[in-house]
Amino acid sequence: MGIKIYKPTSPGRRHQTCSSFEEITTSTPEKSLLIKLKKSGGRNALGRVTSRHQGGGHKQKYRIIDFRRDKISIPAKVASIEYDPYRSARIALLHYVDGEKRYILAPLDLKVGDTVLSGPEADIKPGNALPLKAIPLGTIIHNVELKLGKGAQLARSAGTFAQLMAKEGRYSQVKLPSGEVRMVLQDCYATIGQVGNVDHEKVSLGKAGRARWLGKRPKVRGVAMNPVDHPHGGGEGRTSGGRHPVTPWGIPTKGYKTRTNKSTDRFIVKKRTK
């Protein structure tokens, strides 16, 4: 889980860093848990770009991850820690005692040979999944469900974690990585511990080509465009854009809040800080 630094043998190598992958135990994924996903290139069903700066990238196969953790009271042994091209976190292959195999997000300090369990009676140790009502206050958690039975939606990226702050009635208060404190049903499941691969944020791509391998296309600045393409475009020579920053469609950006009000806003106890 360390960071590998290279000697500056070329301009692209000079600032490049990458993960040492020392926690990876196998390079061969479980075939039964792989599916093919077709790349969209950021286009919708009409062929129009709805998400810019996406396209290309290395061919990948999607690993089916168990975000529900619904095999209650059935122990499983960690068979391997693997790389997943679709996410920043590492994944762990579980072999259940009934013969089934599943992938989960690999929490920090989970090792091959460890036993994990789901259910209210599980121990408070990394990798075990419990309902929030069975988790002590102050516990570091990740992979948190928002809706009962839907599967985990919160705190799934490398190095992230949430914290159980309080319990009141049917709801628990969970502090999320953004600083937001939110009420979540006490019957919703969460996994103990912090997501692994905590050094992911220290990785520097070093060159544009490495971003293209990941399916990321260039982001062209509005001031470098023509007036027909962007509100900041045009002008003689270099310009500042001449107005407060806006999107290509004229909506204020860079700090302007565009989040719409939702019926679930009543579950937010404290707004996000970052």
UniProtKB/Swiss-Prot annotation:
Q: Which GO terms describe its cellular component?
A: large ribosomal subunit
- Identify the stretch(es) annotated as Disordered: 223-258
Keywords (alphabetical) are:
Ribonucleoprotein, Ribosomal protein, RNA-binding, rRNA-binding
Role according to the record: One of the primary rRNA binding proteins. Required for association of the 30S and 50S subunits to form the 70S ribosome, for tRNA binding and peptide bond formation. It has been suggested to have peptidyltransferase activity; this is somewhat controversial. Makes several contacts with the 16S rRNA in the 70S ribosome.
Q: Matching SMART domains, A to Z?
A: Ribosomal_L2, Ribosomal_L2_C
Subunit organization: Part of the 50S ribosomal subunit. Forms a bridge to the 30S subunit in the 70S ribosome.
Q: Is Phosphoprotein among the key words of this record?
A: no
The UniProt similarity line reads: Belongs to the universal ribosomal protein uL2 family.
Q: Which GO terms describe its biological process?
A: cytoplasmic translation
Q: What is this protein called?
A: Large ribosomal subunit protein uL2
Classification via Gene3D superfamilies: 2.30.30.30, Nucleic acid-binding proteins, Ribosomal protein L2, domain 3
Coiled coil regions, renumbered to chain:
none
- Which molecular-function annotations from GO does this UniProt entry contain? rRNA binding; structural constituent of ribosome; transferase activity
